[in-house]
């Protein structure tokens, strides 16, 4: 979903139709990615949080985005199978102020080591159960029904650590010039998304190509 399309009407229509990005019609056999068409090189490198010899791949996402929901199972499998020299991070975007609650919710899960337990559940609650979970209060009530005490969620949600991570996420989003989600950033140097590649299947192929380029010293 492109950044300019994040209106309630667009979200509602997309949710109804499902719009499974990874299931869109595939084109011809994969060809070598083309810079400027399949991916973009950043004008300024973005510092990464990984050590020497490691390659960072970032998924930019938003819980209420139907495309991100459709992509999540595929990306989770890709993340699990990533080579040892690839460090995969998820970064929730904040295109508008009302995105902040869900952005912070992800970092609450991360801080409490609950991403694996809660990340997919939150997507499911929003897109399959059609729950409106876009405020701190609504999210706190939801986690309270899913094994995390509301007070613990609220305390962590309002903590300095979560606020700092959310601020850093927005900085990364801006540094990569994210125009829509889901999107991928590679090695602090490259950016691709479904608008460039037409499908997120292809975006993952492009990310793998770029990982190879980084390994080869590009």
Over which residues does each language-model region extend?
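Extracytoplasmic/secreted proteins, especially bacterial periplasmic and envelope-associated proteins
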Residues: 56-59, 70, 74-77, 100-104, ...
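Structural microenvironment flanking redox-active thiols in thiol-disulfide oxidoreductases
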Residues: 81-112, 116-143
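Extracytoplasmic thiol/disulfide redox context detector
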Residues: 2-97, 212-218
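Sec/Tat-exported extracytoplasmic proteins
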Residues: 61-64, 75, 79-82, 109-113, ...
């Amino acid at each position: 979903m492109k950044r300019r399309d994040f209106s309630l009407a667009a979200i509602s229509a997309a949710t109804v139709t499902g719009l499974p990005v990874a299931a869109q019609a595939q084109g011809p056999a994969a060809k070598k990615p083309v810079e400027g068409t399949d991916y973009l090189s950043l004008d300024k490198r973005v510092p990464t949080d990984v050590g020497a010899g490691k390659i960072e791949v970032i998924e930019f996402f938003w819980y209420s985005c139907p495309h991100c929901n459709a992509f999540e199972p595929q990306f989770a499998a890709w993340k699990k199978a990533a080579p040892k020299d690839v460090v995969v991070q998820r970064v929730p975007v904040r295109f508008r102020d009302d995105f902040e609650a869900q952005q912070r919710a992800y970092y609450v899960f991360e801080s409490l080591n609950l991403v694996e337990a809660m990340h997919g559940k939150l997507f499911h609650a929003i897109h399959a159960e059609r729950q409106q979970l876009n405020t701190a209060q609504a999210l706190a009530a939801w986690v309270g029904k899913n094994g995390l005490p509301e007070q613990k969620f609220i305390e962590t949600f309002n903590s300095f650590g979560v606020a700092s991570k959310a601020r850093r996420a927005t900085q990364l989003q801006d540094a990569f010039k994210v125009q829509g989600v889901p999107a991928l950033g590679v090695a602090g140097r490259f950016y691709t998304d479904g608008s460039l590649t037409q499908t997120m299947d292809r975006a993952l192929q492009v990310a793998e190509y770029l990982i190879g380029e980084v390994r080869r010293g590009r």
